[in-house]
Amino acid sequence: MQQVFFQETEFLNSVIDYDHKVETENLCLDIAYGTDKNFLFGCGISIASILKYNEGSRLCFHIFTDYFGDDDRKYFDALALQYKTRIKIYLINGDRLRSLPSTKNWTHAIYFRFVIADYFINKAPKVLYLDADIICQGTIEPLINFSFPDDKVAMVVTEGQADWWEKRAHSLGVAGIAKGYFNSGFLLINTAQWAAQQVSARAIAMLNEPEIIKKITHPDQDVLNMLLADKLIFADIKYNTQFSLNYQLKESFINPVTNDTIFIHYIGPTKPWHDWAWDYPVSQAFMEAKNASPWKNTALLKPNNSNQLRYSAKHMLKKHRYLKGFSNYLFYFIEKIKH
C-alpha cells in the first residue's frame, strides 16, 4: 500500500452515491472534479457534455465539494439516471486548505485536486481531473484506453508558447519548465507515480513557504509545474483548448476552438452559464449539453457581485443592449460604493 498525504478520515465527511449503471462492469475511467458552491452548475453540465459524446463508454464521475444543496441532489441524481451512469459526491472538510494562497477568482477549492489525486491512490491506476468549466465535444476513448509508462506522473496540455515557458522557467526557478508549462485544469494522473513522488505532500509544503509564495502567480498550477517538470506526457491541445469569453469584448481575437477540439476550457471570470455570455457561438457547446441534461429548463446565472456586474455591463454594451448595459454599470457602481 502506498502512502497517502490526505487521509480520508481527515477530509471526508460523507459520500452520496448516485449509481444508475446498468452494467456490472467495475472497470471504468474515473473522472473527478473539485468544486465549491459556485461551480456546481457548470460541473453538472460538464458531466452531461462528456456523457452526451461518450454514451456507452465506461465512465464513473466523482465530485469533491464542500457544499451540496437539495437542488443539487435532485439534479445530479437525475443526470445519473438519464445517462445510466454513476456519480459520487464527496462532501469534504476543506478547512486545512483555507490557509493556502487564494484570490477573489481562485478559492481554496483549487487545492481539491490534491485531495482527489490522493483519494484514488491504491483505488485506481489513473484518474482524470477536470476543472468544472470544461465542456466536452468529442470522444475521450483514447484517454480511457491510455496506459502510463512507469516514470510519468501525469498527462497534461501546455499553454502558451516556448517564450512563455522560458519566462515561467526563469520566474519559478525550474529549468525543466522550459520544455512546457501546463494548465492544471486537465490532469490525467498516474496515481502510483503521484504517490511515489509524494506530490501532494511536497506541494502543500511548498505552498506554505514564503519564498515560494513570492514566486507563484497561479498557486496550484505553478507548484505542480515546479514539481512535475520532466515527469510529464504532453497531450494535444484539443484536450484543453482554453478560451476566455471576455475575448469577445475585443475588436478582434483568435478563437482556438475547432471541430477537432475535445475539451473547451472556458477560462476567465465570465462563464457560459452566465446570462450575459450564453449566446456567443463558442458558448453553444455548453448550451447544447445543458439542453441534453436535467438542467435544460434551469435559468442561467445573473451577476451577483461587482466584478460580474461590470463584465455583464461590458458584454451587454458590446451586443448593443444599451439599457441592460448601462443599468448593470449603475448597479456595479452602487456595489462598489457599498463595499
UniProtKB/Swiss-Prot annotation:
Amino acids binding Mg(2+): 131, 133, 265
Gene3D superfamilies for the chain: Spore Coat Polysaccharide Biosynthesis Protein SpsA, Chain A (3.90.550.10)
Superkingdom in the source lineage: Bacteria
Assigned EC number: 2.4.1.73
Impact noted for substituting residue 220 to N: Loss of activity. Cannot complement a deletion mutant
Cofactor(s) needed by this chain: Mg(2+)
Stated name of the protein: Lipopolysaccharide glucosyltransferase WaaO
Originating species: Escherichia coli (strain K12)
Source taxonomy: Bacteria, Pseudomonadati, Pseudomonadota, Gammaproteobacteria, Enterobacterales
